[in-house]
């Protein structure tokens, strides 16, 4: 009714200031879904930015999948609305881009479960939200979830930056990924390579 309409008006005016914040929010959902690997891919051209986040978490049933892009649906008990996916969908679509989510629930697909989110943004549109500080988002994810693996790839034209925590883990052995020195190394390396 009236309350829902007012909340929707509030929701549509409060998009995230950077796509990198959406990345952080959605990747956090992957970790909460029990993912051991979350892949984050940003592919840019002069005209478009394509964001793909896929995980091997527990996935969602078809019923839950239909509901997750509704800002009034959430699995959280601490608030009555879930903003991450609905905001990403809205932000992509308001640039004339697209949004797609697919998922396979572990209960139905015990061998190949997980969720994939794909959003395409038109960078030339007036409502385009900039990518922002994606390095900080990736470092924050690793700091908060040192036992989860992340594969981050950012491609712009013919240049590409990749960070695979599985490779770091193999080299570092017992050193935790969220130790200060490792996080500093990751951040400095990504910042240097992100100058594309």
Which role fits each region the language model picked out?
Residues 1-17, 90-196:
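Flexible, glycine-/charge-rich segments associated with ATP-binding catalytic modules
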Residues 16-42, 91:
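Conserved ATP-binding N-box helix of the HATPase_c
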Residues 43-51:
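Short beta-strand-loop-beta element adjacent to the nucleotide/active-site pocket used for signaling
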Residues 55:
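Acidic ATP/Mg2+-coordinating residue in the GHKL
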Residues 60-71:
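Short conserved segment of the HATPase_c
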Residues 73-81:
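Glycine-rich ATP-lid/hinge loop adjacent to the conserved G-boxes
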């Amino acid at each position: 009714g009236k309350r829902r309409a007012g909340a929707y008006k509030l929701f549509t005016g409060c998009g995230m200031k950077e796509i990198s914040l959406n990345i952080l929010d959605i990747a956090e959902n992957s970790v909460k879904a029990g993912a051991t690997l979350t892949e984050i891919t940003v592919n840019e051209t002069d005209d478009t930015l394509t964001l793909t986040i896929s995980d091997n978490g527990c996935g969602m049933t078809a019923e839950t999948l239909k509901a997750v892009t509704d800002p009034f649906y959430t699995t959280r008990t601490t608030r009555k609305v879930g903003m991450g996916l609905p905001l990403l969908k809205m932000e992509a679509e308001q640039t004339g881009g697209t949004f797609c989510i697919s998922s396979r629930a572990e209960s139905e697909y015990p061998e190949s479960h997980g969720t994939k989110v794909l959003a395409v943004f038109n960078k030339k549109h007036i409502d385009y939200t900039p990518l922002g500080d994606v390095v900080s988002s990736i470092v924050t994810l690793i700091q908060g979830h040192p036992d989860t693996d992340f594969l981050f790839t950012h491609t712009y034209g013919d240049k590409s930056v990749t960070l695979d925590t599985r490779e770091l883990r193999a080299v570092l052995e017992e050193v935790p990924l969220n130790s200060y020195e490792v996080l500093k190394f990751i951040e400095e390396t990504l910042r240097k390579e992100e100058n594309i």
